[in-house]
Amino acid sequence: MSANENNLIWIDLEMTGLDPERDRIIEIATLVTDANLNILAEGPTIAVHQSDEQLALMDDWNVRTHTASGLVERVKASTMGDREAELATLEFLKQWVPAGKSPICGNSIGQDRRFLFKYMPELEAYFHYRYLDVSTLKELARRWKPEILDGFTKQGTHQAMDDIRESVAELAYYREHFIKL
């Protein structure tokens, strides 16, 4: 293991909703790949404690999804708050990628970055300002080569580490079938 500026940091958050002014992070996971999308290491998957009052603000979709996955119970049982989760994630990332080198990688990653900016600003600042957003390729494929879209299916567990692994696999799929490298 050594920090390499070409490695990519992949991240996914599960939140109580989509508005960082009202909602909170309830799960964070990261993994690191090399430039060829080979997974080098998986970071900690952390349920971030939130109060019962905060959890009660979730809409029906979030309650159903995060209860079915067991995340609500893990959040209630967790002793890690935003700052502890942020520090544990940074400790992992520093082993693999120097600060400011990796774009933030994932699916619809701009949404996650909004929450990081508000609740985990030190972690948000660890990333390069650029984004590697797999959903951009999906949108381009939908418009320019829709016949390839059915070739990749997500499980959609809405568990952070599962979602990241799927994002890496989805980018590899688009690299082969859309970009054709």
UniProtKB/Swiss-Prot annotation:
Residues annotated as catalytic: Y129
Annotated EC: 3.1.15.-
Uppermost EC category: hydrolase
SMART domains: EXOIII
GO biological process: RNA catabolic process
Deletion consequences: Essential. In depletion experiments the level of oligonucleotides is elevated and that of mononucleotides is severely reduced compared to wild-type.
Keyword Hydrolase: yes
CDD domains named among the record's database cross-references: Orn (cd06135)
Any Pfam family matching the protein: RNase_T
Origin superkingdom: Bacteria
Summary of activators and inhibitors of this protein: Inhibited by adenosine 3',5'-bisphosphate (PAP).
Molecular functions (GO terms): 3'-5'-RNA exonuclease activity; metal ion binding; nucleic acid binding; oligoribonucleotidase activity; single-stranded DNA 3'-5' DNA exonuclease activity
Keyword Cytoplasm: yes
UniProt keywords, alphabetically: Cytoplasm, Exonuclease, Hydrolase, Metal-binding, Nuclease, Zinc
Subcellular location as annotated: Cytoplasm
Domain called Exonuclease: residue spans: 8-171
GO terms for cellular component: cytosol
Complex and partners: Homodimer.
Protein family per UniProt: Belongs to the oligoribonuclease family.
Function: 3'-to-5' exoribonuclease specific for small oligoribonucleotides 2 to 5 nucleotides in length, as well as small (2 to 5 nucleotides) ssDNA oligomers. Probably responsible for the final step in mRNA degradation.
UniProt name for this protein: Oligoribonuclease
Annotated organism of origin: Escherichia coli (strain K12)
